[in-house]
Amino acid sequence: MSLPRLLKVNIRTYDNSIPISESSRKSWNQKHFALTFPKPLQRGTNDKSRPLKSQITVTRHDKRKLEEGQKPAHKWIRHSFRKILQWPPIYTAAREQTPFRHLYTSKTHLKKAEYKKSKDEKGGTPLKKDSKKKGGSYATNPESKQIVEEKTKRQNEADKTPLKSSHENEQSKKSKSSSETNPESQNSKTVSKNCSQKDKKDSKNSKKTNTEFLHTKNNPKKDLKRSKTSNDPISEICSENSLNVDFLMLVGQSDDESINFDAWLRNYSQNNSKNYSLKYTKYTKKDTKKNAKKSSDAESEDSKDAKKDSKKVKKNVKKDDKKKDVKKDTESTDAESGDSKDERKDTKKDKKKLKKDDKKKDTKKYPESTDTESGDAKDARNDSRNLKKASKNDDKKKDAKKITFSTDSESELESKESQKDEKKDKKDSKTDNKKSVKNDEESTDADSEPKGDSKKGKKDEKKGKKDSKKDDKKKDAKKNAESTEMESDLELKKDKKHSKEKKGSKKDIKKDARKDTESTDAEFDESSKTGFKTSTKIKGSDTESEESLYKPGAKKKIDESDGTSANSKMEGLESKRGFRMSSKKTTFNEKGEKASTGRVPPSREKPPLPACEPSLPSPKVRRLCWCKMPPPPPKPRYAPLPEAPWIHKLL
C-alpha cells in the first residue's frame, strides 16, 4: 500500500488491542461460558477410556493472548501492521477520527457563505481561531509551528483575492446596466474581457501558492503524485512523530475547504461576467434580426393586403353584375308569370325556349345579357326534359297555350306526341344555336366583348357537332342492321348447300373406303421398305389412337377398322381444302402402333380378338343390400350423467 493511505490511520500508543469481529466474539463467548460436564457412561465401554479427572479446557483466544504476551514487542507490532494493511477500507474508515467540518457547504447554503464572507471582511474568521487553538494543543515541535504560520499567511492572501473578484463583479454589473441604457455595446464587451483576464491571472497566482495544501477529494491519483514529487516537511514529521498526524490532517482539511470555497467564489464571478456579456450580445443580435424581420414582414403584408383588396374589388364588381342580370331576368319572369306557382314554373320553362329563338334580337338590344343567356341555355336543356314528361298533363298544355303566343305550333305538337317533339326540339336547338353564334360574334365585336361571347359561340358549335354526330350514328346503325340481316340470310343459304354437298361426299367416301382397305396391304409393304408414310395413314392412326383413349377396356373389331379408314379419308379431303393437320402427336398408343407396323406387315398380323364380356361376380357370393342389413349392435352405454346443466353444455 502507498504512504498516503497510512496517513489517514491514527497510530497511537494505546492501540495495542487487536480488533475482533462480531462473529468471532459470539463464538468466543459461547466457548468461554460453556460448562464442561463429564460425559455419561455408556454400556460396553471400558473404564480405561474415560478420563479420571475433569480436564480444564482453555479457549483458543486465551491461548493466542498468552502467546502474544510472551512474544517480543517488535514481532507483535509487525504482525498488527500486517493485519491493518490487509483490512478492507471499511475498517480503516471506522477507525479514523472524525475530522473537523463546517456546519455548511458552500454550494447548497449560499446564504451562510455570504454571512461568513461579511465576517471575513470585518476581521478574522472563527475558523482561524479554532485552528490556532487546536494548533496550540497539538503543536509541540518548532517545525509544526512554522507550518501553521505559513498556512495562516496564505489564508489571509486567499481572503483578499475574493474581495477583488467581488469588486470586479460589481464593476461588470455596472457596465452591463450602462450598456443597456447606452446603445454602445462594444465598450462593455472590452471591459468584461479585461476583467475576466485579470481574474484568471489572480487565480493562477493563488493556485501556485496553495498547491502544497490542495488535497481534492475527487482526484486521489493527483494527490498520490503530489505526495511523491513534493519534498515538503510533512513527510519528515510523519516519519518522526506519529502523534502529530491527526493534527496535520485536520489543519489540511480546514484549509482545503476554505481555499476551495474561495476558488468557487472566483469561478462563479468569472462565469457570471462572461455569461452577462454573451447574453447581451445575443440579445442585441436578436433585436436587430427581429427589427429587420418586422420591416420585411410589414412590407410583405402591405403588398398582400393591396392584392387582396384588388381581388375583393374585382369579385364585388362581378357579383354586382351578376345580381343586376339576375334581377333583370326575375323582373321579366315576374311580369310575364301569373299568380299561381304552377303558371310561374311553366312560364320560366317556356321563356327559356323563347330566348333561344329570340337571341338575335336580344344581342342587338341587350349586349350585356349574353352572360345570363348562356347560363339559361344550360338550364333550358335540363328543363326541356322536364317539359317532355310534364307535357302529358292537360293542365300544363292549357297554361303553355296562354303564355306562349309566338310558339303556338310547338306547344300543340308537344301535346300530341312526345317522341316527335324530342327530335324537332333537337333540330331547332341546332339551327338556333348556329344562328345565335353568328349574331353573338357580330354583337360582341360591336360592343367590345369578344372574349366571353366567342367562348360561348365555340361551346354552341361543339354542342351542334355532337348532336349531328349522334344522328349520323343512328343512321349508320340502321344501315348496319339491314346489311347484317342480308348477310345472315346468305350465310344460311350457303350452309344448306354445304350440308348437301357433305352428304354426297360421305356416300362417295364410303365407296372409296372399301377400295382403300384392299390396297392398304400393298401400301404397308412399301412403307416397311422406305420407312416413310403418307399423310392419310398417319391421320387414320391418330383417329384410332383418340378412339382407343376413350375406350380403354374393349378392343376394336374388323368392322370398326372400316369406319376409321373412312374417317381418315374425310380428314384427308378437309386438309386439301383448308388447313393441314400436324404430322406428329405425342400419344403413347401411336408410338406402339408405329413400332409394330415397321417390323410386321399388317397382312401377317393376327386379327384383333373380340371384345371380352364383363366378368360377372360368382353366384356364390351374395351381397346384401344396405337397406336389408340388420342394424349394428348398440354401443355399450356408460353410467348416466348427473342432471347438471353445465355438463350438457360441455357435451
Swiss-Prot record:
Stretch list, region 8 X approximate tandem repeats: 532-553
The keyword Cytoplasm appears for this protein: yes
Gene Ontology MF annotations: structural constituent of cytoskeleton; structural molecule activity
InterPro entries: CYLC (IPR026189), Cylicin_N (IPR029354)
One GO process term, biological-process aspect: spermatogenesis
One GO CC term on file: acrosomal matrix
Top-rank taxon, per record: Eukaryota
Locations listed in the record: Cytoplasm, Cytoskeleton, Perinuclear theca, Calyx; Cytoplasm, Cytoskeleton, Perinuclear theca
TM region positions: none
Expression across tissues: Testis.
Bias (Polar residues) ranges: 186-195, 230-241, 529-538
Region listing for Disordered, in residue ranges: 110-241, 267-615
Keywords assigned: Cytoplasm, Cytoskeleton, Developmental protein, Differentiation, Repeat, Spermatogenesis
Pfam families cross-referenced by the UniProt entry: Cylicin_N
Basic and acidic residues compositional bias, start-end: 111-129, 146-173, 196-205, 284-308, 318-331, 338-368, 375-402, 413-441, 448-482, 506-518, 587-607
Segments annotated as Sequence repeats: 278-305, 306-342, 343-379, 380-417, 418-453, 454-491, 492-531, 532-553
Bias (Low complexity) ranges: 271-281
Subunit structure: Interacts with proteins of spermatozoa head including ACTL7A, CCIN, FAM209A and SPACA1; the interactions may be necessary for proper acrosome attachment to the nuclear envelope.
Record: disease: Spermatogenic failure, X-linked, 8: A male infertility disorder characterized by a significant reduction in progressive sperm motility, and aberrant sperm morphology. Patient sperm show head and midpiece defects with deformed and detached acrosomes, and flagellar defects.
Role noted for this protein: Plays a role in the establishment of normal sperm morphology during spermatogenesis and is required for acrosome attachment to the nuclear envelope.
Protein name from the UniProt record: Cylicin-1
Annotated organism of origin: Homo sapiens (Human)
Taxonomic lineage: Eukaryota, Metazoa, Chordata, Craniata, Vertebrata
